Amino acid sequence: SYAIIENDELRHRFQTYMEASEFSEGHLFAYLSVAAAYSHGTEWLDQVVAYIKGNVDFTETYLKEHIPAIKMIRPQASYLIFLDCRALGLNQEELNRLFVEDAHLALNDGTTFGKEGEGFMRLNVACPRVTLEKALKQLEQAVMDLK
């Protein structure tokens, strides 16, 4: 990856950190890959964005039909969906247990983003649809087992 930093002071601090961490040197394939992506990647990117939007829609429909207690917040510019799990009536520790131990899923805990994130989990939908569907089925079963 790379960074474009307009501010001279901030760019210098960033470069100093990267050099000290030995992250500053790219390799030939990285440079060629970036150049190719910018020159010839538009069609691929359009397909990926459409696929991810399809996964967002799939998740929304699946939750409404199978796990209505969990609502989703549609992402505006990302493939990360916040799941509003507050209707399940679980505290954050219980919610984490539900996702990790019962559903066997590793999601980001909403409290990573502050106290306002209590009752939320963050789901990455930039994955194959079959993987997403399997995860949602596992979550559905874990929620059904709560009852």
Language model segments and positions:
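Helix N-cap motif at beta-to-alpha junctions
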Residues: 7-8, 87-89, 128-130
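Conserved glycine-rich beta-strand-loop-beta hairpin in the small C-terminal domain of fold type I
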Residues: 28-31, 35, 50-60, 72-85
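Conserved core segment of the aminotransferase class I/II
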Residues: 1-53, 143
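PLP-dependent enzyme catalytic core of the Aspartate aminotransferase-like
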Residues: 98-107, 113-147
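A short linear hydrophobic-aromatic micro-motif
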Residues: 60, 69-72, 106-111
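Alpha-helical elements of Rossmann-like donor-binding domains used by nucleotide-donor carbohydrate transfer enzymes
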Residues: 13, 32-36, 51, 58, ...
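Short alpha-helical functional segments enriched in proximate histidine and acidic residues
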Residues: 59-62, 142
